[in-house]
Amino acid sequence: MGENDLDYGYEPFADTPEYRAVNETIVQRWVNAMREAGSVHLDRIVDLATGVGTMVQLLIEKLPRAAKPKDVVCVDMSDRALEQAGANLAGSVDRVTPIHSPVQDLALEPESVDMAMWGNGVHYLTGEEQRRTFERIREALRPGGWFLFNSAFVAESRPAETLAFYRGQIATAVRSLRERGVKREKSTPAAESAMFLPLSHYRQMLEQTGFRVEEVREVVAQLYQSAWEKISGFSQYAAGALHGYPLDDAAEALVAAVKPALEQYGFVDEHGERYVPRHWYFAIARKELGALRSGE
């Protein structure tokens, strides 16, 4: 990847085969959980931090025909992304309702949606912002409604045997930045996504905000060089890994450091290709019905 190929957005990573495969697996499990519970009728759903609609598209593809939602509420801070999401979903649902808003400020009518999904974004908020968002989601869900989210930025996402890769990549990137005379602003705080909160935090947050936790599970993805270069070029990833450095310089240095770090610390698959595994975790929770509480 050359300098002119850098794209600081998330979509280049979301377009990789690895990303689609791991998220297809997660979405299929979400659909299966709803089917197993006898609850797959989704009239209206909300997709938080929708981007261009990749996750909700996967969901619609996996749902039985009779269960496909009529109205999808897409929430994002980017007007461009919302416009593209609407175009991508055209023909799949009767109506797409775009909302330009931070997810933590979302205000939907009480008990107006059957399901809320949040793909690969919960880790960008502070703990208090997460709490506020969970509370607003619960308020918007109808009784028995579903809350589904995932993340590859929890404490358990990077097993001990993979840490050498991250350290090697960052060391190489920092060395390159110093050689180029790029200064770090030490007073810049680390991004929330660099905090890597544990799974127990999210489980407790769900319970404290009134959800019934149905399932928390992991899916392991083997990420190869191109995928690592694309996520390393994502602005928020670069800001978390090399906080304090100018964003464009940090992203460029991280991308360039992928190949040497993989060569030194990567795992080798059956075809001789190098990769590093990343653990995605997903949660399935419900807004409880009174009958569910009394029957526990």
Regions found by a protein language model. Give the residues of each.
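A short beta-strand submotif of the Rossmann-like class I SAM-dependent methyltransferase core
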Residues: 118-121
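A short acidic, Gly/Pro-enriched loop at the edge of an enzyme's catalytic core
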Residues: 108-116
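C-terminal helical/coil "lid" or tail adjacent to the Rossmann-like core of SAM-dependent
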Residues: 2-9, 13, 214-270
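Short alpha-helix
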Residues: 194-209
